[in-house]
Amino acid sequence: MSLRLTSSLNQNKTTNVNGAISRCLWRTETRCSTGYGSKSGFAEEVGRKKLEIGRLELKWERKLDSLDLFVRRKFEKILFPNGNKSSRKKANLDKNRNIATKVANRFELSLNQPVHFSQTNPKSTPEPPCTSSSGAGDCHENLPADGYPIENDDGMGEPARMLGKIKKPRSRLECIFCKDSHTRSIVNCPNIRKISDRTNILIVQGRKIDNTEKQRKAKKTDVRVGRKFDALRNFIERNIEEVARDEPISEQKVNHRSEFSEQIIFGDYERGPTFLTGNLVSSGLSTFTMDSEVSNDSFGIPGTMPSPKYLVSPISNPTFSNKKTRLIRQCHQLHSRNCAYFVEMSIFQ
């Protein structure tokens, strides 16, 4: 066996482990001997490596032993939760063994389930079609349309389509708008069309809005804010101190004309609006007329929109110095005290 050694002076020296060193190798401290002796730097290096390897082997052997012991103890706790003692009751032992047998049988059954070749390995050759007892057709007569056996039902309405795994249903939330579980967010609700291209509007579900989720939805629905919407934003910013003093702003100050009027309120950004039935005038909040291309049927609400009834936030004295504010267009239906469906206008974003 040949080893290529390196030294501080000569970088490439080929020697034989079992024979004598052909040339003297210089080390940093002392000069080695010409023979394979105990004082040889090469022998010292070999001994040091062997000792290091031995320590590593011992270290990993201890790790494997401890891992094996850990796994054994885990299995014992699962199979024998009351301890592996002679005083353990026979009933508990039989019960645990029965449970372990059922688990093993179920796992074995899941491994033996028939799977189509097209879903596991497309290059595999499928089995030749067999003949049923009637003389024609596929031998699997009781298979449903997708080819999976009915007995392989995981109890969740769908057959288990993966080996060794039970397919779990996707976690879905009920859409507040149409009471359907078609999506986790009402943004994709088929009953809601895109509201307007001239305003930057976010449709959000829930009171608390995650910042990253809001940014993601804003990026999808973010459009350039139109000229009229900018005018409305500037108008609100100019009159923000008057709103904070609970002095209602008369509608004559709004110089915009629109067929679609909305009542816009201020809510607390951190806590979220507390939805209660009320009146904008009694709450000390103002009524604005928003210029937008939003029509009454843009939300997909069947029928005509009723008279303006909104869920308002009873904020008697809102402050805008310490807390971030937002404008919220409330749900058009007075159906719930804790309505979580609202459209947020990112005016102060």
Curated annotation (Swiss-Prot):
- Sequence segments annotated as region (Disordered): 116-148
Per UniProt, the ranges with Polar residues bias are 116-135
Q: What is this protein called?
A: Uncharacterized protein T16H12.1
Name its species: Caenorhabditis elegans
Q: What is the lineage of its organism?
A: Eukaryota, Metazoa, Ecdysozoa, Nematoda, Chromadorea
